[in-house]
Amino acid sequence: MAHETMSFQAEVKQLLHLMIHSLYSNKEIFLRELVSNASDAADKLRFEGLADNALYEDDPNVRIRIGYDKAARTITIDDNGIGMSRDEAIANLGTIARSGTKEFFTKLSGDQQKDAALIGQFGVGFYSGFIVADKITVETRRAGLPASEAVRWESAGEGDFTIDAIERAQRGTTITLHLREGEDELLSSHRLQSIIQKYSDHIALPILMQKEEWDQEKGEMVLKDEDETVNQASALWTRSKSEVSDEQYTQFYQHIAHDHQDPLTWTHNRVEGRSEYTQLLFVPSHAPFDMWNRDYRGGLKLYVKRVFIMDDAEQLLPQYLRFVKGVVDSADLPLNVSREILQESRDVKAIREGVTKRALSMLEELANAEEDAGKEKYKTFWGAFGQVLKEGLGEDHANRERIAKLLRFASTHGDTDAQDVSLADYVSRMKPEQSRIYYVTADAWQAAKNSPHLEVFRKKGVEVLLLTDRVDEWMLSFLQEFDGKPLASVARGDLDLGELNDEEKKAQEEAGEAIKPVVEKMKEALGDKVKEVRVTFRLTDSPSCLVADDNDMSGYLQRMLKAAGQNAPAMQPILEINPEHALVKQLKADSADFGDWCHLLFDQALLAEGGMLDDPASFVKRTNALLLSRAA
């Protein structure tokens, strides 16, 4: 096929500009990314070779070779992995195929360390070569294609690239970086090896370089005609824990997670019995940018007998643990395992159960840590992934109790929005005569903290959990008790504080009788806005509040469903009034403005719980009229 020039996709031009001008101080990443790509190409060859052994072309020893040429000022990264066809070279090197390109650019922070990590996360690591090179040449042939169908791709990184057909006997890919002026310090075995050992020592594939020895006559290091392996070249998870340093675990995590930060914690063990497998699991220290995207792919890397099978094996983890990164290497699964087989396999079910238990154990160790460092790590974890973990109460009945112990909430015990109170903490502080765990849900911490529903609890010194995450209302349908204590909303039903409010009960009944005519007239005035109007003892400072009936949906949940575009069933709240409040005391059932006062008390209660008025203009008009009548 003739020489052809093509333009880069628009986003690639933007990306090249970023690489060249913004990431120079972190230039070592180019080798990390290109070695990682070569490793992926080897994994793909092994995977496709399971079905077609001819792809190995009588060369089964897969490796990566790195070299340099001082005279030509080039660095070469060569692999004999799967290689690329012409169409694949254009697709992989001329466009960013992955969706979310715009998100990539919005996530750039200007922090070179963080931005460098995003490059790998978005699968655009190839372009990092332009940090140190002003021209890149790629020669490649896909395994299984004839030598005449090899391709040369070349670009100076300025907006276009060329494609040529070439002859190439060896399968795989050779990338040649033509270095920019001032990059000659990279043309050294010692320098390249130090970068490889820093970033790529854990790569399971041997990384070869020409051996270098001191030449006494020349008085310098010279290259020999033999190769040496410059990395450990063994799968890290297959080694004994005692052989792996914390630094090596961290580097391995950063490689598989494309993350520049250290993990919070990890666990590494071999399981024997019904299923045999090795697991190496990590908990990240921050959530990925796309954690809540519908097409987010969580899951672990799956290997079978050390042969890479797939990324993102979602069947090995429940959804609520989708943030966990790592590797599972099974001795039992067939090498031709597919995603469909994974869904039906009993071995996979056993692995999933084991991985889930191990992941929860990791979190329990952090949550129960005595030292400050461990406590801080769990705070970091909860801030990043707490809402995701809450999903587990509905998804994983078998581990519901374990998950409940890991939950953290804000509460009235501390004047802060920090979610650091466990259910066990709450129970340990309960009053002797208290039988329930009380909570309030709201859109925000400030709204929850100032909810009128909390007034009687403050008066009696009873702690209330403040729940403000969007997932909380859903979660509560699966979390009905803890340690034998039922959870109760302070804004639902006829509040019963047990022995804590025996005195108020009698006073409430008497007050209710005294203003019974007013209560009945209020129900008439408000009509179908409310299910009921009644006297309450839960208020001490506010004149009124809205509560949901025992089996009804809360106002907060109704608002949340509407905001999500779902149909929320129309449910009428109960209006509760405080008979001791001055506004309620002055209500007269036969006064001309009685109806306005009733609507004002309802609207105030709705606003206090974070609700929206159906008719704000009428509320303002009514309020002004009542203020004027008082002034007169």
Curated annotation (Swiss-Prot):
> Is Nucleotide-binding given among the entry's keywords?
yes
Citing just one GO molecular function, the answer is: ATP hydrolysis activity
Keyword annotations for this protein? ATP-binding, Chaperone, Cytoplasm, Nucleotide-binding, Stress response
Question: InterPro entries from the entry?
Answer: HATPase_C_sf (IPR036890), Heat_shock_protein_90_CS (IPR019805), HSP90_C (IPR037196), Hsp90_fam (IPR001404), Hsp90_N (IPR020575), Ribosomal_Su5_D2-typ_SF (IPR020568)
UniProt-annotated stretches for the region A? 1-339
What residue spans carry the region label B?
A: 340-559
Q: Which domain of life is it from?
A: Bacteria
Localization per Swiss-Prot or TrEMBL: Cytoplasm
Annotated region C: the residues are: 560-632
* One annotated Gene Ontology cellular component of this protein: cytoplasm
Does the keyword section mention Cytoplasm? Answer: yes
Family to which the UniProt record says this protein belongs: Belongs to the heat shock protein 90 family.
SUBUNIT field = Homodimer.
Function as written in the Swiss-Prot or TrEMBL entry: Molecular chaperone. Has ATPase activity.
Listed NCBIfam families = PRK05218.1 (NF003555)
Q: What is this protein called?
A: Chaperone protein HtpG
Source organism of the structure: Burkholderia lata (strain ATCC 17760 / DSM 23089 / LMG 22485 / NCIMB 9086 / R18194 / 383)
